[in-house]
Swiss-Prot record:
Its cofactor is K(+). This is tRNA modification GTPase MnmE. GO terms for biological process: tRNA methylation; tRNA wobble uridine modification. Residues 220-379 form the TrmE-type G domain. It is found in: Cytoplasm. Homodimer. Heterotetramer of two MnmE and two MnmG subunits. Binds 1 potassium ion per subunit.
């Protein structure tokens, strides 16, 4: 497949020590040579080496920029094409000057994600690995990064490949039995199909069982902080964020809108939503905030319900317990540095199986216990382990669910008098759906949409 040579800035725009302009394609080295003047031509430079020199302007014969240029020859590169990376001084002017010079010599400005797209089209990575690159870039915690890294390395791809191979062998045996009954091949009976598909189904279900945790690591937990006004919701948010994000006062109704912030709680990314205190109010601005709080409650994955240790439980408190029934909740009894008036026995009764944590955010007490409770609620205290194959991508989850349904159909049919060649339809469809995860037989529009999510230069 012949492609033109592309170029883009690969480092973040802004002031910095170094900026990188990356080229990829058959003419990458030749274009570099049109600009670069050093001790030797780039064409004569061995692969995977760096050379020092200057980028020159043909017209004025003056230097455009001082640079270190890396030459990497196909196929041992990110895209499996020749790659040249020009390392120049950081800064908007210098990096853009180099990019414009490269484009003037014949390179085309790359589209978002086009370098990774070429890695996919040239067979260096499959589609699930490419999606792992996006997750790696967007990781908000070390745990999320480790999971994404395993996907980039191909751990999910290998699992999918193993399942597809087992299905392919089953399909092949069925077809041999039908088309060449005289051959001495294994007879693929309905009973044997049942056994093989049961194994495949168990593997698919095992992958889907990781989806909830995987989604949490990829997208973060939408976490609503709720409670009556002035119980310490904003102080809780500030304790987890470690900065004064919300206004903390003794005046009820201070938080009149929802505030959002991402925080890392023991490897679990939380998208914290500090809601306005839920109460009846005549203040029109505060009332809008209260309505948004109720909406945030409906959309949350985790609820942090804050109570005041220094006050008796109110009807509003009990109504909040009723509102979050059936959801994942951590109950926080705050202000334990003050004289206690709350009925802790009643609190535990209302909390049921949900954890109850006593805190004083003013004195920084109980924060560690709170973080431990959140981590245990979703990861039983930890997510690290030898097997970090988590399914987190919505596209993968959807395809696995479809594959699961067809595997179940094949198993159900194998227990009836349905002919083997009809059972094969569901077996084949299971194989096809798993293939779509790694990029087999996917539409070009899907590929274009996926890579458009990348930043320029990746």
């Amino acid at each position: 497949m012949e492609m033109d040579t592309i170029a883009a800035i690969s480092t973040a725009l802004g002031e910095g020590a170094i900026g990188i302009v990356r080229l990829s394609g058959d003419q990458a080295i030749a274009i570099g040579d049109k600009l670069f003047k050093g001790t030797k031509r780039l064409e004569d430079t061995p692969s995977h080496t760096i050379v020092y020199g200057h980028l020159m302007d043909d017209a004025s014969e003056e230097a455009i920029e001082e640079a270190m240029v890396t030459v990497m020859r196909a196929p041992r590169t990110y895209t499996r094409e020749d790659i040249v990376e020009i390392n120049c001084h950081g800064g908007l002017v210098s990096v853009n000057r180099v990019l414009q010079a490269v484009l003037a010599k014949g390179a085309r400005l790359a589209e978002p994600g086009e370098f990774t797209k070429r890695a996919f089209l040239n067979g260096r990575i499959d589609l699930s690995q490419a999606e792992g690159v996006i997750d790696l870039i967007r990781s908000k915690t070390d745990r999320a990064m480790n999971v994404a890294l395993r996907q980039v390395e191909g751990r999910l791809s290998k699992k999918i490949g193993k399942l597809r191979q087992a299905l392919l062998e089953t399909i092949a045996s069925i077809e041999v039995n039908i088309d060449y009954p005289e051959y001495d091949a294994e007879t693929m009976t309905a009973k044997l199909i049942n056994e093989k598909m049961t194994i495949v189904l168990a593997e698919i279900e095992a992958l889907l069982a990781t989806a909830k945790q995987g989604k949490v690591l990829r997208e973060g937990l939408a976490t609503a902080i709720i409670g009556r006004p002035n119980v310490g919701k904003s102080s809780l948010m500030n304790s987890l964020v470690h900065e004064a994000k919300a206004i903390v006062t003794d005046i009820p109704g201070t938080t009149r809108d929802t505030l959002e912030e991402y925080v890392n709680v023991r490897g679990v990314p939380l998208r914290l939503i500090d809601t306005a205190g839920i109460r009846e109010t005549e203040d029109i601005v505060e009332r809008i905030g209260v309505e948004r709080s109720r909406q945030a409650l409906k959309e949350a994955d985790l609820i942090l319900l804050v109570l005041n240790y220094a006050e008796k439980l109110s009807k509003e408190d009990e109504a909040l317990f009723e509102a979050v029934k059936g959801l994942d909740v951590v109950v926080i009894v705050n202000k334990i540095d003050q004289t206690g008036r709350i009925d802790m026995e009643r609190v535990r009764q209302l909390a049921g199986e949900n954890p109850v944590v006593a805190t004083s955010f003013l004195q920084e007490e109980g924060v560690d216990q709170l973080e431990e409770a959140i981590s245990r609620l979703f990861f039983a205290g930890g997510v690290e382990g030898a097997d970090l194959t988590y399914v987190s991508n919505a596209r993968h989850i959807g395809l696995l669910n479809q594959a699961k349904a067809h595997a179940e159909e094949a198993i159900a049919a194998s227990l009836t008098d349905v002919p083997v060649d009809l059972i094969q339809i569901d077996v084949t469809r299971t194989w096809e759906l798993l293939g779509e995860i790694i990029g087999e037989d996917v539409q070009d529009s899907l590929i274009d949409q996926l890579f458009s999510q990348f930043c320029l230069g990746k």
